[in-house]
Amino acid sequence: MSIFLCFLLLLPLSLILFKKLLPSKGKLPPGPIGLPIIGNLHQLGKLLYKSFHKISQEYGPVVLLRLGVVPVIVVSSKEGAEEVLKTHDLETCTRPKTAATGLFTYNFKDIGFAPFGDDWREMRKITTLELFSVKKLKSFRYIREEESELLVKKISKSVDETQNSSVDLRKVLFSFTASIICRLAFGQNFHQCDFVDMEKVEELVLESEANLGTFAFADFFPGGWLIDRISGQHSRVNKAFYKLTNFYKHVIDDHLKTGQPQDHSDIVSVMLDMINKPTKADSFKVTYDHLKGVMSDIFLAGVNGGANTMIWTLTELSRHPRVMKKLQEEIRAMLGPNKERITEEDLEKVEYLKLVMVETFRLHPPAPLLLPRLTMSDIKIQGYNIPKNTMIQINTYAIGRDPKYWKQPGEFIPERFLDSPIDYKGQHFELLPFGAGRRICPGMATGITMVELGLLNLLYFFDWSLPNGMTIEDIDMEEDEGFAIAKKVPLVLIQTSHRW
């Protein structure tokens, strides 16, 4: 049976649901006219946030699209985002379900994609207490500092071995963030772990995230699962999922080995105790699926998100020599010459680095589209009626580049945040790299500290330049597809140890 024939068989049911989901009254947001059955799917490219941005430029900051039989509201303004994430936070703080997210979160047993409710509250409480609290952030400081030292030693070694050597920063920084995340969350030191190959871990994260971000026919059409199976989509996603699950199995088995040394008491150990030694006071039962769901959130978001942010920051600095020079001069002036080791206390001394980070988040947010929300009741956004069970997407990429909020929005100008109250912590809705409200990213502080410390080391100890014959205009800024904004073409720079 062909895919086309399957699609024809599903048409009658799709038409019925399409009409049922079509709101019959009230002022709805504007949007492009869709085709029968598929709606607006044909108007979307591989980079959804750019497709949404283009549509919003024509139809306005609040747009109604229909993806198959699924109504979707795209919000591309500060004002609309504030209404969704603050005014109507409680009515919109659950998540829609897709085939891929259900699979990679072990039936929504995680934090990021879990529906709003008691289970989500309990899981967030556990992870906040055991991983993301201020106390835990401070206790994991030694891990971040040790891995930063190793990063510097690794690059210094390559400089000593080959003059004017170049470095593929994607590989180096991916290894850096993966090592930190896995040590603080899983208690696994990749440098001493016999079942981990860093090359395979990188492949695992990228493949998992790519499949996690894919849409299936089942997400938009009743009975679409049949087309997913015939097309091979179901098989591809499951193959990636099984690889990820096998990695988690190794981590869990390693924890269950008697006498196996760990860096510290990590969240895997804590949740294993909850699973194997539940107390009578525990009304919420933690399962292995909860454990693996949380591992997915931390591993996929933490590793790739952190590496991407560091790469985009160094890319923008390479494209703007004035900013690079100013930042390195401030860092070296504030930290002093010939410093052997950088600590997290040094982060408080470099104000311009923080401005550079905020500007990077504006142009290259870790999630160009915040994780989708689902309305739990009828609400109004910017005067438009938004029915219950409607998916809402906040386009942070579009908001961060809107000339209504930013002068010269396409330019990388960290000074725009000098003496500005705007930050990235969810209180200023023109800048939302980590979201806002009840579903704000709980690992924000951990991720920021890791990224800033890594960059501080790279910019203090090394001078960076483009490979011979390459100019600023040659730097490729193309973005790759997926949940996160990744640089498609690796950033390769020449590093030299700084001489005082």
UniProtKB/Swiss-Prot annotation:
Query: Which Gene Ontology cellular-component terms appear in the entry?
Result: membrane
Question: Where exactly are the transmembrane stretches of this chain?
Answer: 3-23
Classification via Pfam families: p450
Q: How does it sit in the membrane?
A: Single-pass membrane protein
GO function term, MF aspect, one: iron ion binding
What cofactor requirement does the entry state? heme
Q: Which residues bind heme?
A: C441
Q: Where is the major localization of this protein?
A: membrane
Any coiled-coil regions, as ranges:
none
Q: What does the UniProt keyword field contain?
A: Heme, Iron, Membrane, Metal-binding, Monooxygenase, Oxidoreductase, Transmembrane, Transmembrane helix
Reading the lineage from the top rank, the first entry is Eukaryota
User: Which CDD domains does this UniProt record tie to the protein?
Assistant: CYP71-like
Q: State which Enzyme Commission number(s) the record gives.
A: 1.14.-.-
Compartments reported by the entry: Membrane
Q: Which family does it belong to?
A: Belongs to the cytochrome P450 family.
Q: Which PANTHER family does the UniProt entry name for this protein?
A: CYTOCHROME P450 71B11-RELATED, CYTOCHROME P450 71B38-RELATED
Q: What is this protein called?
A: Cytochrome P450 71B38
